[in-house]
A protein has these predicted regions:
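Structural signal for conserved beta-strand scaffold positions within catalytic alpha/beta enzyme cores
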Residues: 18-20, 89, 120, 136-138
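Active-site HxH/HxHxD metal-binding segment of metal-dependent hydrolases
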Residues: 45-128
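Short, Lys/Arg-enriched N-terminal segments with co-localized hydrophobic residues
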Residues: 3-12
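Divalent metal-coordination and catalytic microenvironments
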Residues: 31, 42, 67, 121, ...
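Short solvent-exposed loop/turn micro-motifs enriched in small/polar/acidic residues
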Residues: 22-24, 112-114, 118-120, 140-144
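Conserved beta-strand hairpin/beta-sheet module of binuclear metal-dependent hydrolase folds
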Residues: 13-56, 148-155
Length: 155
């Protein structure tokens, strides 16, 4: 079940949807952007993300991974293959994206699929994805590359 984190504004700007996904109920966020293309943050399950996108008439444009634990990117490889979406991920955790042992995949009941980000980002960087501007704030502790993402919806 998805939960809208923000309600639609009067000018019909997009919502931010929160979906608890995968074996651990990891929070995934889906933000509709320009041209019905969505940004998906921390996709723990490709099948559930694809079902949500299809139900809401959205196409996947960009995947963002906030840190290197597998429960936050378990669905990313499949989504990249099936949609051609680009992948952005936190740079300090780069080694975790290709190692089952480093990203704790051994503790999950799904097959490990490594990812290769198209772009790695660092604390303080800004980027645009599907017409949405994001600012990265490093939040090391959970992992060295854990980060927060800030965006303004509708202004």
């Amino acid at each position: 079940m998805s939960v809208p984190v923000s309600s639609k504004k009067e000018n019909d700007m997009p919502q931010i949807y929160q979906l608890p996904l995968g074996a651990l109920g990891t929070n995934c966020y889906i933000i509709p952007g320009e041209d019905s293309r969505a940004v998906v943050i921390d996709p723990a399950s490709a099948a559930e993300v694809e079902m949500f996108l299809n139900t809401h008439g959205l196409k996947l444009g960009t995947i963002i991974v906030t840190h290197g634990h597998y429960d936050h990117f378990a669905g990313a490889a499949q989504l990249m293959e099936s949609t051609g979406a680009s992948l952005l991920a936190s740079a300090p955790d780069e080694a975790m994206y290709s190692s089952a042992a480093k990203c704790w995949a051994d503790f999950m009941p799904v097959e490990f699929r490594p990812i290769k980000p198209d772009k790695l980002f660092l604390d303080g960087e800004e980027f645009t994805a599907e017409g949405l501007k994001f600012r990265v704030m490093g939040a090391p502790g959970h992992t060295a590359g854990s980060c927060l993402l800030f965006t303004e919806i509708g202004g």
